[in-house]
Amino acid sequence: MNRQPAEGLRHDKDSLSLPTAAGVPGKLRELIRRVRLARIIEGGAIGVALWCILFAVELLPGILSDTPGVLLFGLVGAAAQASRVRRGLLVILVLAAAVVVVVTQTPLSNILAARWVRADQFPDSGVSAVVALSAGLNPDTTINSEALDHLINGLELVRAGKASELVTTTVEERFPAGAVKSTVDQSRIVSLFGGNTKWISTSDVKSTRDEALRSAELLLPTGVRRIAVVASPMHTRRACSAFEAVGFEVTCVPARMRSAGGQDPGPWPADRLKVFGDWVYEVAATARYRARGWLDSGPPERAARPL
């Protein structure tokens, strides 16, 4: 009589602590779903983090540097995290983060800039023309700060009597509001320096190679061979060699930069990351240009000009 309630009580306790056989698969499936969802979210976050790092060093080409690039990196990261390559994705992020730490905390970028930037001594006799290279555009019809720095440096050389005429290259970009051409803002800026500057612009270009070819078509038939090329500091080596490859005798002039980076980067992360990213890009682009025969193949002493 006294044992039955105890057995009943034990039976009730067991029924509360042990799930039924039918409930196990459902809870397991729910756990799996949660784990998979967490991995997908983690992968997406890793993908976006990689995009941020590459964006900071300006190594994202074309549309990847624009708004769709963020979503694409997130989706790729989520897909990779849901597959067997998720460890590889994490390793890539760790390596990228390590590079950022090294670049921002050491003078590596200053060393790279000192060894890479080409700055030729300007000839006492001057040059026939100075070519200011283009860069990016803004939707409000203005050229970006990099292109502005090139143009101002070029105008200064002409005003100082070191060049007879100014040549600018022409780029065009399409925005939601319509197409924007660099000549619109270039003409505004040239006019601010007075109307005495002899200024001509090339036809549209899409690359440094195009800039060299269009400038050659414009200047060489008129006998203009000795020129100065104004470019962003880390771009000088490839740009000036590309102009030499089409027949010019070039004096290379690194522009003074008002934005991050420059010939002598500051000790803050923005400058160091910008210079490092430019160096990585220029090394790859220089190799591609050399493989295609678009760079000057002059004697070694010309390639080893003082930096």
Give the ranges of each region predicted by the language model:
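Short, low-complexity intrinsically disordered segments enriched in A/P/G/S/L with frequent Arg
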Residues: 6-10, 16-18
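Short, Lys/Arg-rich N-terminal segment immediately upstream of the first membrane anchor
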Residues: 24-38, 82-83
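Membrane-embedded alpha-helical segments of integral membrane proteins
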Residues: 36-81
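Short glycine-centered helix-capping/turn motifs at secondary-structure transition points
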Residues: 58, 158-161, 293
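A structural signal for short, hydrophobic/glycine-enriched beta-strand patches
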Residues: 68, 102-273
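Transmembrane alpha-helices and immediately adjacent membrane-cytoplasm interface residues
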Residues: 77-113
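A transmembrane-helix-recognition feature enriched in membrane-embedded lipid enzymes
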Residues: 272-299
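Extracytoplasmic/luminal low-complexity segments enriched in Pro/Gly and acidic/polar residues
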Residues: 298-307
